[in-house]
Amino acid sequence: MKITFLGTGTSCGVPTLGCSCKVCRSTNPHDSRLRCAALVETDTTRLLIDCGPDIRQQLMPLPFRRIDGVLLTHMHYDHVGGIDDLRPYCRFGTIPLYGDRKTLRHVRQCMPYCFPHGLVQRIEKSLPWLKLKLYPGVPSLSLNPIHAHRSFSVGDIEVLPINVLHGKLPILGFRIGRDFAYITDMKSMPEDELQYLKGVRTLVVNALRFEKPHHSHQLVADAVAFAHKVGAEQTWLIHFNHDIGLETEAQAKLPRNVGLAYDGLEIEV
């Protein structure tokens, strides 16, 4: 199974608008970070994790092939704001979106034109003489509620949602297959959730920066401690802002089995 890191930045991305710090001025491409998203691929299945406002740019260099589903960690714009940009992929068929009920409700409310079918059916039932036609440019998407600790499959990829806290907001992390887990925007995780990560060998987890605590995101030290709890053999950090520092300098501060992921990084798990 191949994982491609499409974006490894926070909601503002890096460079940050209006900033002239050394990270935002860096010419090292690994210091430029789009909003967080990832692509999980097997020989037969392609699964997106999150779909933020940079998704068009992130998918442009990749082969144009069917997307079998999208896992949504939570409702914030930097994780769902690019869903409409998936419409070219709908020529391969309807794209299922998977998320908790609150996230899916938010997506429907923000993009009602993407989900007109229920409304059309209700109108046709009450006013059968009114001949309605769907706008042909509307993307074909389906909303599929998922629940923590209830596994499901997308193609040949098995997914187990896990409870995570983004500050006070409950969100989802994902164990994908037997050996891999992807968690972003975490501040904390209930202790009883750790059992669902037992045996994970490759962990992806967020780490905003080294210093200055944040109310809803963990720092690098928190992420390293969490990886130790999980017992992962290899950990990749994501969701940085420009305070993380230059990639080469930041990487030198990390343990041997913890790496700073960067946009475009591909790993096999």
Predicted features and spans:
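Cap/insert and terminal regions of metallo-dependent hydrolase folds
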Residues: 188-268
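Binuclear metal-dependent hydrolase catalytic cores
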Residues: 1-182, 192, 249-269
